[in-house]
């Protein structure tokens, strides 16, 4: 009898917790988790239009909410776009919460936006900047996988027993550190027809 009561009580608690979780999820779905517009690092009209287009196609509210918040996250929070001293686009892409740029990660982070490049000149220029920055990084050290935004040694891996230049964040060679920039450059060129990225920095 007691065991049955305890089991029933446990089931009731579990049921209550599930109800609370569903309420929290429902609240979250109504909430926009993107940064305020003024705090977004890069804005693309083509990306915003794509979000609205896909929202209408997704019948599941949770999936629509996830796409709305996740698809633009790289642009909102990690892309630092500017012009270099040579006047060419230069885009440094943080890898999440680490203020360094991984060759592999940055190539994957901006990949979904390439399909929209022809609809947004600023987005196209930003993507070209990612590729040009990747080429510069590889020319600094083809055996490094992650780079700082300039010659700013951050101290994390400077004591590694390898040739650590001040521009490097990590020097842990991976074959995909070279594959991803090549993949991104080819995809960008095939999509846009823009061959200007293949300049003197090109490998």
Predicted regions, residues:
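Sec/Tat signal peptide C-region and signal peptidase I cleavage site
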Residues: 11-13
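Low-complexity, Ser/Thr/Pro/Gly-enriched N-terminal "stalk/linker" regions
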Residues: 16-104
């Amino acid at each position: 009898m007691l065991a049955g009561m305890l089991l029933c009580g446990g089931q009731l608690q579990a049921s209550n917790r599930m109800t609370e979780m569903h309420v929290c999820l429902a609240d979250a779905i109504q909430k926009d988790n993107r940064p305020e517009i003024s705090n977004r690092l890069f804005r693309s009209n083509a990306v915003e239009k794509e979000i609205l287009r896909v929202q209408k196609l997704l019948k599941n509210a949770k999936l629509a909410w996830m796409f709305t918040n996740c698809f633009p996250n790289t642009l909102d929070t990690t892309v630092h776009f500017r012009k270099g001293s040579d006047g060419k686009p230069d885009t440094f892409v943080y890898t999440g919460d680490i203020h360094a740029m991984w060759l592999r990660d940055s190539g994957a982070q901006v990949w979904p936006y390439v399909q929209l490049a022809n609809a947004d000149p600023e987005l196209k220029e930003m993507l070209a900047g990612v590729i040009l920055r990747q080429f510069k990084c590889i020319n600094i050290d083809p055996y490094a996988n992650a780079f700082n935004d300039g010659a700013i040694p951050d101290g994390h891996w400077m004591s590694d027993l390898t040739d650590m230049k001040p521009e490097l964040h990590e020097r842990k060679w991976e074959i995909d550190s070279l594959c991803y920039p090549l993949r991104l450059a080819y995809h960008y060129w095939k999509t846009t027809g823009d061959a200007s990225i293949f300049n003197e920095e090109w490998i």
